[in-house]
Protein backbone atom coordinates (compact mmCIF):
# COMPACT_ATOMS: atom_id res chain seq x y z
CA UNK A 1 0.00 0.00 0.00
CA UNK A 2 1.22 3.55 -0.56
CA UNK A 3 0.01 7.10 -0.83
CA UNK A 4 1.01 9.23 -3.80
CA UNK A 5 0.71 13.00 -3.49
CA UNK A 6 -2.11 12.80 -0.97
CA UNK A 7 -3.85 16.02 0.04
CA UNK A 8 -6.80 16.25 2.37
CA UNK A 9 -9.05 19.02 3.62
CA UNK A 10 -11.63 19.57 6.32
CA UNK A 11 -13.75 22.15 4.53
CA UNK A 12 -11.32 24.98 3.76
CA UNK A 13 -8.61 23.83 6.14
CA UNK A 14 -5.96 21.68 4.50
CA UNK A 15 -4.77 18.87 6.77
CA UNK A 16 -2.42 16.90 4.50
CA UNK A 17 0.07 18.38 2.06
CA UNK A 18 1.29 16.21 -0.76
CA UNK A 19 2.03 13.13 1.35
CA UNK A 20 3.74 10.31 -0.54
CA UNK A 21 4.31 7.45 1.83
CA UNK A 22 4.91 3.78 1.01
CA UNK A 23 3.92 1.09 3.53
CA UNK A 24 5.99 -2.09 3.37
CA UNK A 25 4.02 -5.29 3.07
CA UNK A 26 3.96 -7.58 6.11
CA UNK A 27 5.69 -4.96 8.19
CA UNK A 28 4.58 -2.64 10.94
CA UNK A 29 4.81 1.04 10.02
CA UNK A 30 4.32 3.59 12.78
CA UNK A 31 3.22 7.14 12.08
CA UNK A 32 4.36 9.54 14.77
CA UNK A 33 4.11 13.26 15.27
CA UNK A 34 2.68 15.90 17.60
CA UNK A 35 -1.06 16.54 17.90
CA UNK A 36 -2.52 18.05 14.78
CA UNK A 37 0.20 16.79 12.47
CA UNK A 38 -2.32 14.91 10.34
CA UNK A 39 -1.57 11.34 11.32
CA UNK A 40 -5.19 10.45 12.09
CA UNK A 41 -6.34 12.22 8.93
CA UNK A 42 -3.81 10.25 6.92
CA UNK A 43 -4.84 6.91 8.32
CA UNK A 44 -8.51 7.70 7.68
CA UNK A 45 -7.71 8.40 4.06
CA UNK A 46 -6.31 4.91 3.77
CA UNK A 47 -9.70 3.27 4.24
CA UNK A 48 -11.84 6.05 2.82
CA UNK A 49 -13.26 7.06 6.18
CA UNK A 50 -12.08 10.65 5.90
CA UNK A 51 -14.55 11.43 3.13
CA UNK A 52 -17.46 10.63 5.47
CA UNK A 53 -16.83 13.82 7.43
CA UNK A 54 -19.10 16.56 6.07
CA UNK A 55 -17.21 18.91 3.71
CA UNK A 56 -14.11 16.72 3.73
CA UNK A 57 -12.08 16.46 0.55
CA UNK A 58 -9.34 14.15 -0.65
CA UNK A 59 -7.03 14.62 -3.59
CA UNK A 60 -4.25 12.37 -4.74
CA UNK A 61 -3.87 8.63 -4.87
CA UNK A 62 -3.79 5.80 -2.41
CA UNK A 63 -2.57 2.63 -4.08
CA UNK A 64 -3.54 -0.80 -2.80
CA UNK A 65 -2.06 -3.68 -4.80
CA UNK A 66 -1.42 -1.34 -7.66
CA UNK A 67 -4.92 0.16 -7.86
CA UNK A 68 -5.97 3.57 -6.63
CA UNK A 69 -8.62 3.03 -3.96
CA UNK A 70 -10.17 6.36 -4.91
CA UNK A 71 -10.78 5.18 -8.43
CA UNK A 72 -14.30 6.00 -9.52
CA UNK A 73 -15.16 2.40 -10.35
CA UNK A 74 -14.55 1.24 -6.81
CA UNK A 75 -17.03 0.85 -3.97
CA UNK A 76 -15.75 2.38 -0.73
CA UNK A 77 -17.41 -0.40 1.27
CA UNK A 78 -15.30 -3.00 -0.54
CA UNK A 79 -12.15 -1.03 0.20
CA UNK A 80 -13.05 -0.85 3.86
CA UNK A 81 -13.42 -4.61 3.99
CA UNK A 82 -9.88 -4.95 2.61
CA UNK A 83 -8.39 -2.27 4.84
CA UNK A 84 -9.49 -2.86 8.42
CA UNK A 85 -9.41 -0.31 11.22
CA UNK A 86 -9.10 -0.40 14.99
CA UNK A 87 -10.03 2.75 16.85
CA UNK A 88 -8.57 4.58 19.81
CA UNK A 89 -11.43 3.79 22.15
CA UNK A 90 -12.57 0.16 21.92
CA UNK A 91 -16.00 0.16 20.30
CA UNK A 92 -17.58 -3.31 20.36
CA UNK A 93 -21.27 -3.30 19.43
CA UNK A 94 -23.01 -3.11 22.81
CA UNK A 95 -26.13 -4.95 21.72
CA UNK A 96 -24.30 -7.92 20.21
CA UNK A 97 -22.78 -10.97 21.85
CA UNK A 98 -19.03 -11.55 21.69
CA UNK A 99 -19.40 -14.03 18.87
CA UNK A 100 -21.79 -11.77 16.92
CA UNK A 101 -19.36 -8.88 17.37
CA UNK A 102 -16.53 -10.84 15.81
CA UNK A 103 -18.55 -11.98 12.80
CA UNK A 104 -20.36 -8.65 12.23
CA UNK A 105 -18.18 -7.82 9.23
CA UNK A 106 -18.81 -11.22 7.66
CA UNK A 107 -22.55 -10.76 8.11
CA UNK A 108 -22.36 -7.41 6.31
CA UNK A 109 -20.64 -9.20 3.44
CA UNK A 110 -23.56 -11.62 3.23
CA UNK A 111 -22.17 -14.72 4.93
CA UNK A 112 -25.08 -16.58 6.52
CA UNK A 113 -23.82 -20.12 7.18
CA UNK A 114 -23.80 -20.52 10.96
CA UNK A 115 -20.95 -23.00 10.93
CA UNK A 116 -18.75 -20.78 8.78
CA UNK A 117 -19.43 -17.87 11.12
CA UNK A 118 -18.64 -19.90 14.24
CA UNK A 119 -15.40 -21.15 12.69
CA UNK A 120 -14.40 -17.63 11.68
CA UNK A 121 -15.17 -16.37 15.20
CA UNK A 122 -12.99 -19.05 16.79
CA UNK A 123 -10.18 -18.45 14.33
CA UNK A 124 -10.15 -14.69 14.86
CA UNK A 125 -10.44 -14.93 18.63
CA UNK A 126 -7.51 -17.34 18.68
CA UNK A 127 -5.48 -14.97 16.55
CA UNK A 128 -5.87 -12.26 19.18
CA UNK A 129 -5.32 -14.70 22.05
CA UNK A 130 -8.78 -14.08 23.42
CA UNK A 131 -10.29 -17.47 22.66
CA UNK A 132 -9.37 -19.16 25.94
CA UNK A 133 -10.60 -16.22 27.96
CA UNK A 134 -14.03 -15.99 26.34
CA UNK A 135 -14.83 -19.38 24.84
CA UNK A 136 -17.34 -20.11 27.61
CA UNK A 137 -18.99 -16.71 27.26
CA UNK A 138 -19.46 -16.30 23.52
CA UNK A 139 -23.13 -15.53 23.94
CA UNK A 140 -22.53 -12.78 26.49
CA UNK A 141 -22.42 -9.14 25.55
CA UNK A 142 -19.12 -7.68 24.46
CA UNK A 143 -19.55 -4.83 26.89
CA UNK A 144 -18.76 -7.02 29.91
CA UNK A 145 -15.08 -7.38 29.00
CA UNK A 146 -12.19 -5.31 30.30
CA UNK A 147 -10.79 -2.47 28.17
CA UNK A 148 -7.89 -4.54 26.91
CA UNK A 149 -10.15 -7.49 26.12
CA UNK A 150 -12.59 -5.22 24.31
CA UNK A 151 -9.82 -3.83 22.16
CA UNK A 152 -8.64 -7.34 21.31
CA UNK A 153 -12.25 -8.15 20.47
CA UNK A 154 -12.28 -5.20 18.07
CA UNK A 155 -9.06 -6.42 16.51
CA UNK A 156 -10.59 -9.90 16.14
CA UNK A 157 -13.62 -8.30 14.53
CA UNK A 158 -11.39 -6.49 12.05
CA UNK A 159 -9.44 -9.67 11.31
CA UNK A 160 -12.52 -11.79 10.69
CA UNK A 161 -13.12 -10.21 7.28
CA UNK A 162 -9.53 -11.10 6.34
CA UNK A 163 -8.28 -7.67 5.32
CA UNK A 164 -4.96 -7.07 3.64
CA UNK A 165 -4.02 -4.05 5.72
CA UNK A 166 -4.80 -3.25 9.34
CA UNK A 167 -4.95 0.38 10.43
CA UNK A 168 -4.65 1.19 14.11
CA UNK A 169 -5.39 4.67 15.37
CA UNK A 170 -3.68 4.94 18.78
CA UNK A 171 -5.11 1.55 19.81
CA UNK A 172 -3.55 1.51 23.26
CA UNK A 173 -4.06 5.06 24.45
CA UNK A 174 -7.18 4.11 26.45
CA UNK A 175 -5.61 1.00 27.99
CA UNK A 176 -3.50 0.19 31.04
CA UNK A 177 0.14 -0.93 30.64
CA UNK A 178 -0.59 -4.66 30.96
CA UNK A 179 -3.26 -4.54 28.28
CA UNK A 180 -1.00 -2.32 26.17
CA UNK A 181 1.81 -4.85 26.35
CA UNK A 182 -0.53 -7.64 25.19
CA UNK A 183 -1.70 -5.59 22.24
CA UNK A 184 1.81 -4.56 21.25
CA UNK A 185 2.84 -8.21 21.22
CA UNK A 186 -0.23 -8.93 19.10
CA UNK A 187 0.77 -6.24 16.61
CA UNK A 188 4.16 -7.85 16.19
CA UNK A 189 2.52 -11.27 15.70
CA UNK A 190 0.07 -9.90 13.16
CA UNK A 191 2.65 -8.63 10.70
CA UNK A 192 3.30 -12.21 9.58
CA UNK A 193 -0.04 -12.17 7.77
CA UNK A 194 -1.00 -8.52 7.45
CA UNK A 195 0.45 -5.11 6.73
CA UNK A 196 0.02 -3.07 9.89
CA UNK A 197 -0.04 0.72 10.03
CA UNK A 198 -0.19 2.16 13.52
CA UNK A 199 -0.63 5.77 14.55
CA UNK A 200 0.80 6.50 17.96
CA UNK A 201 1.77 9.48 20.01
CA UNK A 202 3.81 7.20 22.25
CA UNK A 203 7.37 7.21 20.90
CA UNK A 204 8.46 4.27 23.02
CA UNK A 205 5.61 2.23 21.58
CA UNK A 206 6.74 3.03 18.06
CA UNK A 207 10.25 1.98 19.00
CA UNK A 208 8.93 -1.28 20.47
CA UNK A 209 6.67 -2.47 17.69
CA UNK A 210 7.45 -0.77 14.40
CA UNK A 211 9.84 -1.82 11.65
CA UNK A 212 9.45 1.48 9.83
CA UNK A 213 8.56 4.86 11.27
CA UNK A 214 7.21 7.96 9.54
CA UNK A 215 7.39 11.33 11.26
CA UNK A 216 4.78 13.91 10.32
CA UNK A 217 4.47 17.55 11.24
CA UNK A 218 1.72 20.04 10.30
CA UNK A 219 0.34 17.81 7.57
CA UNK A 220 3.63 17.04 5.85
CA UNK A 221 5.74 13.92 5.86
CA UNK A 222 9.06 15.01 7.31
CA UNK A 223 11.02 11.80 7.43
CA UNK A 224 10.57 8.10 6.75
CA UNK A 225 12.97 5.33 7.65
CA UNK A 226 13.75 2.20 9.62
CA UNK A 227 12.69 2.72 13.20
CA UNK A 228 16.23 2.31 14.49
CA UNK A 229 17.52 4.96 12.10
CA UNK A 230 14.76 7.42 12.95
CA UNK A 231 15.42 7.12 16.65
CA UNK A 232 19.19 6.86 16.68
CA UNK A 233 20.30 9.05 13.80
CA UNK A 234 17.41 11.05 12.32
CA UNK A 235 18.29 13.01 9.21
CA UNK A 236 16.00 15.99 9.76
CA UNK A 237 16.53 18.49 12.57
CA UNK A 238 12.80 18.60 13.20
CA UNK A 239 12.67 14.82 13.68
CA UNK A 240 15.58 14.95 16.08
CA UNK A 241 13.93 17.68 18.14
CA UNK A 242 10.65 15.73 18.34
CA UNK A 243 12.35 12.46 19.25
CA UNK A 244 14.36 14.07 22.00
CA UNK A 245 11.27 15.73 23.38
CA UNK A 246 12.23 19.33 22.64
CA UNK A 247 8.64 19.81 21.46
CA UNK A 248 5.57 17.66 21.07
CA UNK B 1 -22.98 34.33 57.43
CA UNK B 2 -23.14 30.60 57.78
CA UNK B 3 -26.50 30.73 59.48
CA UNK B 4 -28.01 32.92 56.79
CA UNK B 5 -26.80 30.64 54.04
CA UNK B 6 -28.28 27.61 55.73
CA UNK B 7 -31.56 29.44 56.15
CA UNK B 8 -31.70 30.35 52.46
CA UNK B 9 -30.80 26.75 51.60
CA UNK B 10 -33.63 25.37 53.73
CA UNK B 11 -36.07 27.96 52.40
CA UNK B 12 -35.32 27.08 48.79
CA UNK B 13 -35.59 23.36 49.42
CA UNK B 14 -38.91 23.99 51.14
CA UNK B 15 -40.09 26.09 48.20
CA UNK B 16 -39.10 23.38 45.71
CA UNK B 17 -40.99 20.74 47.67
CA UNK B 18 -44.02 23.00 47.94
CA UNK B 19 -44.10 23.65 44.19
CA UNK B 20 -43.74 19.96 43.39
CA UNK B 21 -46.69 19.21 45.66
CA UNK B 22 -48.67 22.01 44.00
CA UNK B 23 -47.97 20.44 40.64
CA UNK B 24 -48.85 16.92 41.67
CA UNK B 25 -52.05 17.74 43.58
CA UNK B 26 -54.15 18.56 40.47
CA UNK B 27 -52.98 15.35 38.81
CA UNK B 28 -53.83 13.23 41.82
CA UNK B 29 -57.11 15.02 42.21
CA UNK B 30 -58.12 14.34 38.62
CA UNK B 31 -57.12 10.70 38.88
CA UNK B 32 -59.07 10.31 42.10
CA UNK B 33 -62.18 12.08 40.85
CA UNK B 34 -62.33 10.19 37.57
CA UNK B 35 -61.76 6.90 39.34
CA UNK B 36 -64.35 7.59 42.01
CA UNK B 37 -67.05 8.75 39.62
CA UNK B 38 -66.29 6.33 36.85
CA UNK B 39 -65.87 3.08 38.73
CA UNK B 40 -69.60 2.67 39.29
CA UNK B 41 -70.19 2.54 35.56
CA UNK B 42 -67.70 -0.26 34.95
CA UNK B 43 -69.15 -3.71 34.60
CA UNK B 44 -69.18 -6.45 31.97
CA UNK B 45 -71.92 -4.66 30.03
CA UNK B 46 -69.73 -1.58 29.75
CA UNK B 47 -67.39 -3.50 27.49
CA UNK B 48 -69.88 -5.70 25.64
CA UNK B 49 -72.91 -3.51 25.03
CA UNK B 50 -73.24 -0.64 22.59
CA UNK B 51 -74.17 2.89 23.64
CA UNK B 52 -77.78 3.18 24.78
CA UNK B 53 -80.40 5.81 23.96
CA UNK B 54 -80.84 8.71 26.32
CA UNK B 55 -82.45 7.86 29.67
CA UNK B 56 -82.50 4.20 28.74
CA UNK B 57 -81.14 1.77 31.30
CA UNK B 58 -78.42 -0.72 30.38
CA UNK B 59 -76.05 -0.40 27.48
CA UNK B 60 -72.34 0.27 27.62
CA UNK B 61 -69.44 1.79 25.70
CA UNK B 62 -68.34 -1.32 23.86
CA UNK B 63 -68.67 0.29 20.43
CA UNK B 64 -66.74 3.35 21.58
CA UNK B 65 -63.91 1.24 22.90
CA UNK B 66 -63.88 -0.75 19.69
CA UNK B 67 -63.91 2.45 17.66
CA UNK B 68 -61.02 3.97 19.56
CA UNK B 69 -58.96 0.80 19.24
CA UNK B 70 -59.59 0.60 15.48
CA UNK B 71 -58.82 4.28 14.96
CA UNK B 72 -55.60 4.10 16.99
CA UNK B 73 -54.48 0.94 15.19
CA UNK B 74 -55.07 2.40 11.73
CA UNK B 75 -53.50 5.71 12.69
CA UNK B 76 -50.43 3.90 13.95
CA UNK B 77 -50.27 2.00 10.67
CA UNK B 78 -50.13 5.34 8.86
CA UNK B 79 -48.16 7.44 11.31
CA UNK B 80 -45.50 5.11 12.69
CA UNK B 81 -43.81 3.99 9.46
CA UNK B 82 -43.77 7.48 7.94
CA UNK B 83 -42.67 9.04 11.23
CA UNK B 84 -39.90 6.47 11.73
CA UNK B 85 -38.58 6.78 8.20
CA UNK B 86 -38.62 10.53 8.56
CA UNK B 87 -36.79 10.31 11.89
CA UNK B 88 -34.19 7.98 10.39
CA UNK B 89 -33.67 10.35 7.49
CA UNK B 90 -33.26 13.50 9.56
CA UNK B 91 -30.84 11.77 11.91
CA UNK B 92 -28.71 9.65 9.62
CA UNK B 93 -28.92 11.26 6.20
CA UNK B 94 -29.99 14.80 6.77
CA UNK B 95 -26.83 16.81 7.19
CA UNK B 96 -27.68 18.90 4.13
CA UNK B 97 -30.09 21.77 3.54
CA UNK B 98 -32.80 19.31 2.57
CA UNK B 99 -32.59 17.57 5.93
CA UNK B 100 -32.69 20.87 7.81
CA UNK B 101 -35.82 21.89 5.91
CA UNK B 102 -37.52 18.60 6.75
CA UNK B 103 -36.60 19.02 10.39
CA UNK B 104 -38.00 22.54 10.42
CA UNK B 105 -41.23 21.50 8.73
CA UNK B 106 -41.53 18.65 11.22
CA UNK B 107 -41.36 21.11 14.09
CA UNK B 108 -44.02 23.28 12.43
CA UNK B 109 -46.27 20.29 11.85
CA UNK B 110 -45.90 19.26 15.46
CA UNK B 111 -47.21 22.64 16.54
CA UNK B 112 -50.35 22.65 14.40
CA UNK B 113 -53.47 22.56 16.59
CA UNK B 114 -55.32 19.29 16.27
CA UNK B 115 -58.54 20.99 15.22
CA UNK B 116 -56.75 22.52 12.24
CA UNK B 117 -55.65 19.08 11.15
CA UNK B 118 -59.26 18.05 11.58
CA UNK B 119 -60.53 20.84 9.34
CA UNK B 120 -57.97 19.98 6.70
CA UNK B 121 -58.94 16.32 6.61
CA UNK B 122 -62.60 17.35 6.62
CA UNK B 123 -62.03 19.36 3.48
CA UNK B 124 -59.83 16.82 1.77
CA UNK B 125 -61.45 13.52 2.71
CA UNK B 126 -64.82 13.89 4.40
CA UNK B 127 -66.36 16.13 1.77
CA UNK B 128 -65.28 14.08 -1.28
CA UNK B 129 -66.40 10.88 0.46
CA UNK B 130 -69.67 12.52 1.45
CA UNK B 131 -69.48 11.63 5.09
CA UNK B 132 -67.49 10.91 8.21
CA UNK B 133 -65.36 7.79 8.15
CA UNK B 134 -62.77 5.74 9.98
CA UNK B 135 -60.38 6.45 7.13
CA UNK B 136 -60.68 10.18 7.64
CA UNK B 137 -60.17 9.85 11.39
CA UNK B 138 -57.13 7.64 10.95
CA UNK B 139 -55.57 9.98 8.43
CA UNK B 140 -56.04 12.91 10.77
CA UNK B 141 -54.62 11.12 13.81
CA UNK B 142 -51.87 9.48 11.75
CA UNK B 143 -50.81 12.85 10.38
CA UNK B 144 -50.58 14.15 13.92
CA UNK B 145 -48.39 11.21 14.91
CA UNK B 146 -45.84 11.73 12.15
CA UNK B 147 -43.96 14.72 13.59
CA UNK B 148 -44.11 13.33 17.14
CA UNK B 149 -42.60 10.02 16.12
CA UNK B 150 -40.16 11.68 13.71
CA UNK B 151 -38.76 14.10 16.29
CA UNK B 152 -38.45 11.64 19.16
CA UNK B 153 -37.01 8.80 17.07
CA UNK B 154 -34.58 11.24 15.46
CA UNK B 155 -33.40 12.23 18.93
CA UNK B 156 -33.13 8.59 19.95
CA UNK B 157 -30.97 7.83 16.92
CA UNK B 158 -28.78 10.88 17.42
CA UNK B 159 -28.10 9.70 20.97
CA UNK B 160 -26.46 6.54 19.66
CA UNK B 161 -22.70 7.19 19.89
CA UNK B 162 -20.82 7.78 16.66
CA UNK B 163 -18.39 5.02 17.60
CA UNK B 164 -21.01 2.50 16.53
CA UNK B 165 -21.43 4.09 13.10
CA UNK B 166 -17.66 4.18 12.68
CA UNK B 167 -17.21 0.57 13.79
CA UNK B 168 -19.86 -0.60 11.36
CA UNK B 169 -18.60 1.48 8.42
CA UNK B 170 -14.98 0.46 8.97
CA UNK B 171 -15.98 -3.19 8.54
CA UNK B 172 -17.19 -2.48 5.03
CA UNK B 173 -20.92 -2.18 5.61
CA UNK B 174 -23.10 -0.24 3.21
CA UNK B 175 -24.77 2.95 4.40
CA UNK B 176 -28.23 1.44 4.86
CA UNK B 177 -26.74 -1.46 6.81
CA UNK B 178 -24.92 0.90 9.15
CA UNK B 179 -28.15 2.82 9.60
CA UNK B 180 -29.90 -0.43 10.50
CA UNK B 181 -27.19 -1.08 13.10
CA UNK B 182 -27.84 2.33 14.64
CA UNK B 183 -31.60 1.73 14.66
CA UNK B 184 -31.15 -1.61 16.42
CA UNK B 185 -29.04 0.12 19.04
CA UNK B 186 -31.78 2.64 19.67
CA UNK B 187 -34.66 0.20 19.55
CA UNK B 188 -35.71 0.76 23.16
CA UNK B 189 -35.89 4.50 22.79
CA UNK B 190 -37.66 4.22 19.45
CA UNK B 191 -40.23 1.82 20.88
CA UNK B 192 -40.79 4.32 23.69
CA UNK B 193 -41.29 7.10 21.16
CA UNK B 194 -43.90 5.05 19.30
CA UNK B 195 -45.79 4.11 22.46
CA UNK B 196 -45.89 7.68 23.72
CA UNK B 197 -47.16 8.90 20.35
CA UNK B 198 -49.91 6.28 20.50
CA UNK B 199 -50.81 7.35 24.03
CA UNK B 200 -51.02 10.95 22.85
CA UNK B 201 -53.40 10.38 19.96
CA UNK B 202 -55.60 8.00 21.93
CA UNK B 203 -56.76 11.03 23.88
CA UNK B 204 -57.50 13.31 20.92
CA UNK B 205 -61.04 14.59 20.44
CA UNK B 206 -61.20 17.67 18.22
CA UNK B 207 -60.02 16.08 14.98
CA UNK B 208 -62.42 13.15 15.44
CA UNK B 209 -65.39 15.48 15.70
CA UNK B 210 -64.60 16.59 12.17
CA UNK B 211 -63.44 13.34 10.63
CA UNK B 212 -64.64 10.06 12.07
CA UNK B 213 -67.85 11.48 13.49
CA UNK B 214 -69.84 9.44 15.96
CA UNK B 215 -71.96 6.33 15.72
CA UNK B 216 -74.09 4.27 18.04
CA UNK B 217 -73.34 1.17 16.04
CA UNK B 218 -70.41 -1.18 16.21
CA UNK B 219 -67.78 -0.86 13.49
CA UNK B 220 -69.37 -1.23 10.04
CA UNK B 221 -66.60 -0.36 7.61
CA UNK B 222 -63.66 1.97 7.12
CA UNK B 223 -65.70 4.33 5.01
CA UNK B 224 -68.33 4.68 7.73
CA UNK B 225 -68.31 6.84 10.83
CA UNK B 226 -67.42 5.15 14.10
CA UNK B 227 -67.84 5.95 17.77
CA UNK B 228 -64.81 6.74 19.89
CA UNK B 229 -64.23 7.04 23.62
CA UNK B 230 -63.19 10.68 23.41
CA UNK B 231 -66.04 11.87 21.23
CA UNK B 232 -68.58 10.00 23.35
CA UNK B 233 -67.19 11.52 26.52
CA UNK B 234 -67.67 14.96 24.98
CA UNK B 235 -71.13 14.14 23.66
CA UNK B 236 -72.46 12.38 26.77
CA UNK B 237 -70.90 14.64 29.38
CA UNK B 238 -72.56 17.77 28.09
CA UNK B 239 -75.93 16.07 27.75
CA UNK B 240 -78.57 16.45 30.46
CA UNK B 241 -79.15 12.71 30.76
CA UNK B 242 -77.79 10.98 33.85
CA UNK B 243 -77.25 7.55 32.31
CA UNK B 244 -75.14 9.13 29.59
CA UNK B 245 -73.18 11.18 32.12
CA UNK B 246 -72.37 8.06 34.13
CA UNK B 247 -71.17 6.28 31.01
CA UNK B 248 -69.03 9.31 30.21
CA UNK B 249 -67.32 9.06 33.60
CA UNK B 250 -66.73 5.36 33.00
CA UNK B 251 -65.27 6.11 29.58
CA UNK B 252 -63.03 8.77 31.08
CA UNK B 253 -61.76 6.22 33.58
CA UNK B 254 -61.04 3.64 30.88
CA UNK B 255 -59.28 6.23 28.74
CA UNK B 256 -57.20 7.36 31.67
CA UNK B 257 -56.26 3.78 32.51
CA UNK B 258 -55.17 3.16 28.91
CA UNK B 259 -53.05 6.31 28.65
CA UNK B 260 -51.57 6.03 32.15
CA UNK B 261 -50.99 2.34 31.53
CA UNK B 262 -48.93 3.00 28.40
CA UNK B 263 -46.88 5.67 30.17
CA UNK B 264 -46.22 3.52 33.21
CA UNK B 265 -45.32 0.52 31.05
CA UNK B 266 -42.81 2.65 29.17
CA UNK B 267 -41.25 3.82 32.43
CA UNK B 268 -40.98 0.32 33.81
CA UNK B 269 -39.44 -1.13 30.66
CA UNK B 270 -36.85 1.63 30.30
CA UNK B 271 -35.98 1.90 33.98
CA UNK B 272 -32.26 1.61 34.59
CA UNK B 273 -31.31 1.30 30.96
CA UNK B 274 -28.86 3.50 29.13
CA UNK B 275 -30.42 6.31 27.16
CA UNK B 276 -29.95 4.68 23.81
CA UNK B 277 -30.55 1.02 24.53
Model feature map: region roles:
Chain B
Residues 59-89:
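Transmembrane alpha-helix signature in integral membrane proteins
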Amino acid sequence: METVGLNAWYGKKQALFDVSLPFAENRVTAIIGPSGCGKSTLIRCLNRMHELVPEAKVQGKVMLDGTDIYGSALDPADIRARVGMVFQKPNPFPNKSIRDNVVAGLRYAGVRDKRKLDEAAERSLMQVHLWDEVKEDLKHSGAGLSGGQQQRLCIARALAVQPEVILMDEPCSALDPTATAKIEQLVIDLKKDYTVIIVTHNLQQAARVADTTAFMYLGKLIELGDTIDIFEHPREGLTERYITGKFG
Amino acid sequence: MNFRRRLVDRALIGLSIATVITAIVPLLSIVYDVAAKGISAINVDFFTQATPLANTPGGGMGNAIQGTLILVALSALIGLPIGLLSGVYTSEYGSNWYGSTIRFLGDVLAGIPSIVTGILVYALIVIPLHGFSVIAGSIALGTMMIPIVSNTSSQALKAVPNSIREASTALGSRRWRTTLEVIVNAKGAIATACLLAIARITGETAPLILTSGISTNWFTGVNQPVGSLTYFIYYFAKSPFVNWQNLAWGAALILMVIVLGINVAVRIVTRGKRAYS
